[in-house]
């Protein structure tokens, strides 16, 4: 008896594996060479700026500020506000609108609105933490400068990559609803609920990705 083919596991972080499932990609991508990939993302100007941040003697810290627990509380407030928006109820597309030319449009708009909120909130928070880090010590001021260069260099790439997530979710939406096209209303509602759960899961995973630099800055702020 012939064995059923098994899908090769997709390597990488949970967010990447989730997106691969939405794409229904049966191949396991080769892990990229991170250093080679970063080299293509840095133009000469960025590379020189980063080199200066790493090589120049750090400037004296202005006031030697210590870690303030309010920074933790600020991060928690920002995260909680974004989580509340992600978990807010999403109105499913009405059955009468399911035959519209683009029934996925409300979900796309919702996801993109959440992305904009996350980008604004995490960007502002990252800047505030970096300013505080720069005031703690000369070494931490250098770290803050490096983080600023990395954000300026990588954020446009990150924005471009994350902008493709709604399109992958659209493929997932179409696949789910094509499979339920001949089902009854209850089965269709179940399919919609499953999709909305996956949409929230994607937003939660993206939020974690966006908070990685913030968590790194917080850890640096706590270090004496």
Feature names for model-found ranges:
Residues 80-212:
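Extended, well-ordered protein cores
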Residues 1-108:
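N-terminal leader/presequence regions that precede the main folded/catalytic core
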Residues 220, 224:
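Inter-helical turn/loop segments and adjacent helix faces that build the functional surface
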